[in-house]
Design a protein with these regions (language model features):
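Active-site neighborhoods and metal-handling regions in enzymes and metal-associated proteins
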Residues: 1-402
Length: 402
């Protein structure tokens, strides 16, 4: 009879070059293990894409299946689905245990095999669903559950030199995408065609710089006219017209790390009302970048940009907060909410944090200068200020195009 195991090892092929060195992953795990010890936890079950990637390098593709990274004082084990075969083991730091599809809940049987019963378990309350929490209790019968979401987020907010080096590459690749957009803009071109040109340029550059990586998720949002009113509006087939406001957004993804460039442009011509709004948003952007200093809170930076917009009678057109952290994140995983430029975030900026400044004004159709105006740069907080990592210029001098 054909064996139908609940879980097994697939060590297929040779382990790949990981995004970071073994010493980098060990340093991250050391901090996590210290956090577990401080909270009297014997094991962590990390289930989010961002935390698994952060602590071991493996970025999973769920497709409806659960994944985990189990960290104890002695072990680091990825729990992966059989559909992926040997790829998770090749792409992770530590060991990998694969569960089969022969019966439901083999994932939890594999977790139980590593952890056992009655332990103090750390988990991610902001990621593990209520249904999966119930299964955790059934299969592991933990003596206690401890939420690790906030502690792991705080750790990710502080970037290592190796992470900063990768983010620098990402910002440079985003600039390449920006120039590709600028060069592709012409009357009658569709948003989708311009976006594809920039995406292809970035993916080729990522492959050149990181020949041992896996390539996934790099994208471009390129919006025109009415479509610029929202920062996250999808690309469409709208064709560009003279005088259109444009929103350029390039997002290279490198080993699960997100970077971005965002700029306002106009097609061939800009009217005086639009130019006034554009210049005001650029001024707010420059003010905001100057406020990003060590020792200053996110709330204080936000208040400073708010005051500027209020003085210019524009605050009512603000769309969202003024910036956020960078690292292991994308539009569908990894938000670091403790490092966002919002009124209710009191986090104090410290050297090694990486954060954006990205003010946006949206004026609805019918008002003079209607459209969405946004500038976005990535900044590294340093000992004596900040360093802007994007180099593509902002403002009217370069960005009236086509």
């Amino acid at each position: 009879m054909t064996p139908r195991p609940e879980f097994y090892h697939i060590h297929n092929g040779e382990q790949a070059v990981l995004p970071f060195s073994d010493s980098e992953y060990e340093a991250r795990l050391e901090v996590l293990r210290a956090s577990l010890e401080a909270q009297d936890c014997s094991a962590a079950i990390l289930t989010s894409m961002h935390n698994i990637a952060y602590y071991c390098g493996f970025l999973y593709c769920a497709f409806g299946r659960p994944y985990a990274l189990i960290v104890t004082a002695q072990t680091t084990v990825v729990i992966s689905a059989g559909i992926d075969a040997g790829q998770p083991w090749r792409r992770c730091y530590g060991d990998c245990l694969t569960y089969s599809d022969w019966q439901r809940d083999n994932f939890w049987r594999a977790v139980h095999h590593v952890i056992g019963l009655g332990q103090e378990i750390g988990y991610e309350a902001d990621h593990l669903t209520m249904a999966q929490c119930a299964k955790l209790d059934v299969f592991l019968k933990p003596s206690r559950r401890v939420d690790l979401a906030a502690a792991t987020m705080r750790q990710r907010m502080q970037k290592s030199p190796a992470e900063i080096a990768l983010i620098r590459h990402g910002a440079q690749v985003a600039d390449i995408g920006g120039y590709a957009v600028r060069d592709a803009v012409q009357l009658g071109a569709r948003e989708i065609d311009i976006a594809m040109v920039a995406r292809d340029a970035m993916e080729a550059e990522i492959a050149r710089r990181f020949p041992d990586a896996e390539y996934r998720d790099t994208w471009v949002w390129f919006q025109s006219g009415i479509n610029t009113d929202g920062a996250h509006n999808p690309v469409t087939g709208r064709r560009l017209e003279r005088g259109d406001i444009l929103s350029l957004n390039t997002f290279p993804m490198i080993n699960g790390y997100y970077t971005a460039l965002e700029r306002t442009l106009f097609v061939q011509d800009v009217d005086k009302d639009s130019l006034r709004l554009w210049q005001a948003n650029v001024a707010a952007h420059e003010l905001g970048m100057g406020l990003l200093q060590p020792g200053v809170s996110c709330a204080a930076v936000t208040a400073g940009v708010n005051r500027f917009f209020e003085e210019h009678d524009l605050l009512q057109y603000r769309s969202f907060g003024y910036g956020h952290s960078f690292g292991v994140l994308s539009h569908y995983y990894g938000r670091e909410a403790g490092l966002e430029l919002r009124e209710d975030v009191e986090t104090v900026l410290t050297p090694g944090m990486v954060i954006s400044m990205e003010p946006m004004l949206t004026l609805p159709k019918g008002l003079p200068g209607a459209g969405g105006y946004r500038e976005h740069d990535i900044l590294l907080i340093t000992e004596d200020g900040n360093e802007r990592l994007n180099a593509y210029p902002y403002g009217p001098d370069l960005n009236i195009v086509g």
